[in-house]
């Protein structure tokens, strides 16, 4: 349920469930898109009409009970009497799940207990893993599992990889491949004799080019939902990924206000397009800001903030084509601030060195702690390691950046709420 897609956004994932029903799935597990980009009430309703079972062993209500729609595993017996244990595990992001009123636990603890539980009943064990390639390899090395159907890191095994007698399979992303696993079992002894898996390009399948009536129906339904008018702009709001515009500055200021911060900070590349004068709909806002990215407030030392400001000014950072972290745009673009004035050094030819940084009109103090309203993707991975290691972070969930954008447009002096 990637809310980048208008059907997922408009239906809160219910359209995705309809498509899974049509594809005749028996078992699924959830990933972080379902778990931490949907509000709890939407996740609790996501599978109301599912024609399949949802397996996720390590997700709980805060009280410690599993949600009604989830089971840890399923023992599936074929017509030949072969019992297969299907186990569902999802990646744990405790801080994010906690913000959404869930409790997520270490998937391996539950894997161990389930393997012990099904040992005497199951002839074959299959893990539906939304844990990523490295964790799948770890499970293969350390546990007695026959097949791991992988996800999360969007890797591709065109042929299944056998590791420590565990078959690792994964089909990348976006439905570009469909997986086929073949298991050969001795009917008498119920022993697994052979296993093989491959990923097949969906464009090679006969039905690939045929329009699916369910998708067409969902597209029409979503188009109607997303046509809801939000504001009427009295003037256009253009964007430029490499220069500050009133629109991008407004967004930085909106993050500052939303997070109750001293400073707002956001990259211009999060706004994929500008907005024209006139009526702006939900669909327009989703189109220009489709990212499943959350606002967050950070406590940052002046020293670290200065380092981030310097790094953000580098051409290689502004031109960086970002993949992942919730970002669905093209490039990072220029870093835009509210409450920050960057004064470059006057050395001839200088583009990077700074004479001073003013925070709300006063020189930045290296030892002072500042509150920064920004976006969660800066706290992940390699973009800004200085921010990813901060201990004092507050994420705002389930609100997404486009919710901040919507509020900003409604209160914009050159707009009228509809």
Predicted regions and their residues:
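Acidic, metal/ion-coordinating pockets
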Residues: 1-201, 242-250, 254, 395
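Feature captures C-terminal
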Residues: 276-418
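Structural signal for hydrophobic packing residues in well-ordered secondary-structure cores
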Residues: 47, 91, 112-115, 119-122, ...
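Pocket-edge structural micro-motifs
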Residues: 56, 88, 170, 265-267, ...
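A short C-terminal boundary segment appended to hydrolase-like catalytic domains
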Residues: 186-280, 412-418
């Amino acid at each position: 349920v990637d809310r980048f897609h208008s059907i997922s956004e408009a239906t809160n994932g219910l359209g995705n469930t309809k498509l899974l029903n049509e594809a005749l799935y028996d078992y699924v597990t959830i990933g972080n898109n379902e778990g931490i980009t949907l509000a709890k009430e939407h996740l609790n309703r996501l599978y109301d009409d599912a024609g399949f079972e949802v397996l996720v062993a390590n997700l709980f209500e805060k009280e410690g009970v599993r949600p009604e729609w989830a089971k840890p595993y399923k023992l599936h017996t074929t017509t030949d009497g072969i019992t297969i244990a299907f186990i569902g595990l999802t990646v744990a992001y405790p801080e994010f799940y906690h913000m959404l009123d869930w409790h997520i636990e270490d998937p391996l603890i539950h894997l161990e207990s389930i393997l012990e539980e099904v040992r005497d009943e199951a002839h074959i064990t299959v893990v539906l893993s939304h844990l990523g390639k490295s964790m799948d390899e770890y499970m293969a090395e350390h546990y007695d599992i026959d097949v791991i159907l992988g996800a999360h890191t969007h890797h591709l095994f065109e042929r299944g990889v056998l590791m420590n007698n565990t078959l690792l399979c994964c089909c990348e992303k976006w439905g570009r491949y469909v997986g086929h696993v073949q298991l050969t079992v001795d009917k008498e002894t119920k022993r697994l004799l052979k296993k093989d898996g491959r990923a097949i390009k969906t464009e090679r399948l006969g039905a690939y080019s045929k329009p699916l009536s369910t998708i067409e129906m969902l597209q029409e339904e979503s188009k109607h939902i997303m046509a809801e008018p939000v504001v009427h702009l009295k003037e256009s709001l253009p964007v430029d990924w490499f220069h500050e515009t009133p629109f991008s500055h407004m967004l930085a200021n909106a993050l500052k206000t939303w997070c109750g911060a001293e400073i707002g900070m956001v990259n211009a590349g999060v706004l994929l397009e500008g907005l024209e004068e006139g009526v702006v709909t939900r669909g327009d806002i989703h189109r220009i800001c489709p990212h499943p990215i959350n606002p967050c407030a950070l406590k940052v030392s002046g020293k670290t903030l200065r380092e981030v400001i310097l790094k953000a000014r580098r051409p290689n950072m502004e031109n960086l084509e970002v993949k992942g972290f919730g970002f669905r745009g093209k490039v990072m673009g220029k870093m835009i601030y509210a409450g920050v004035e960057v004064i470059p050094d006057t050395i001839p030819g200088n583009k990077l060195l700074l004479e001073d940084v003013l925070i709300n009109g006063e020189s930045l103090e290296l030892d002072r702690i500042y509150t920064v309203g920004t976006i969660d993707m800066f706290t992940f991975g390699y973009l800004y390691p200085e921010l990813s290691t901060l201990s004092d972070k507050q994420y705002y969930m389930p609100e997404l950046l486009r919710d901040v954008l919507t509020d900003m447009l409604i209160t914009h002096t050159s707009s009228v709420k509809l």
